[in-house]
């Protein structure tokens, strides 16, 4: 169970004197690096996302999920995991491609409201929220590269992650389902779980989904500047989940004191570069530390969780860790909303640690790879059985 005493580092990214080249920038940059080295994530204070915008994005999710199923089914897209999806009648998702571009968001709302001009308020809310989270992502990535002395690669790095294939995935879990899970879980969401729904149905569910689509109701919405992100706005509905699991490494706390667990998302690492996550009111996120302890992250206004992914770990030659984390909802009869951007390398970008990060003390840990190939392996039959995806896919044998 997540500890209430342990806390993630809290870093203020909205200080008025925080400008590149300033003493405050150097101070915060050092704090960001240490947090990512120690925890793989941190809590960012960023009051540039107004409380009004926070409430607007959550009201947007409520309005979208309240639409009839036949209306949501109008949301179609040829890309995998984008467009309307129903997941074993336990959750559903909507998707927007290139969600940083307002006209694309308008196309999405016009699918749902075809007899008018879509929904201008929803479109603008999604765009504004995506832009703010992208500001955090770009700032943190710049600080990371500067702190390791590879600032000469910053511009190329930002261009290599241009927001070209952004998506908005809205995922919801049916309320009061009462799901009991008995699973063999070895890595993260790669595990195949046998799910028995409390509504009397027996469902075999494959929980191997990508960063854009999380079984606990995450979001993915992309947008912004110079980065390929998926910004997610989603929900966790309290699904009264009991878990009895065998794990191959990172546990899902098997039957701890027979306590009912509300597991929205099994233990996993993200495969992308960075995730910037916003929890709205209902807590649930738990992060695993180096010494195998869980930190339960409590939501608060104007704070966002910045999480490093496997791709960043490889790019930085293992100097930054990608933390295992999960979602465990304990609130009763309440819906948990979250929103996040997932920054991913664009197609054909090869992830390789710069030569400046490789020396006798830090030998090369991972072979160069294309993010799409890593993701394909992650979802393959072989990949689903692997405990540590990144190491299994591209670790240097001598490392």
Swiss-Prot record:
2-oxoglutarate binds at residue 336. InterPro entries: DIOX_N (IPR026992), IPNS-like_FE2OG_OXY (IPR044861), IPNS-like_sf (IPR027443), Iron_ascorbate_oxido_reductase (IPR050231), Oxoglu/Fe-dep_dioxygenase_dom (IPR005123). Its cofactor is Fe(2+). Binds 1 Fe(2+) ion per subunit. Keywords: Iron, Metal-binding. It comes from the Eukaryota. One of its GO terms (molecular function) is metal ion binding. The keyword Iron applies. Fe cation binds at residues 268, 270, 325. Residues 248-345 form the Fe2OG dioxygenase domain. Belongs to the iron/ascorbate-dependent oxidoreductase family. This is Probable inactive 2-oxoglutarate-dependent dioxygenase AOP2.
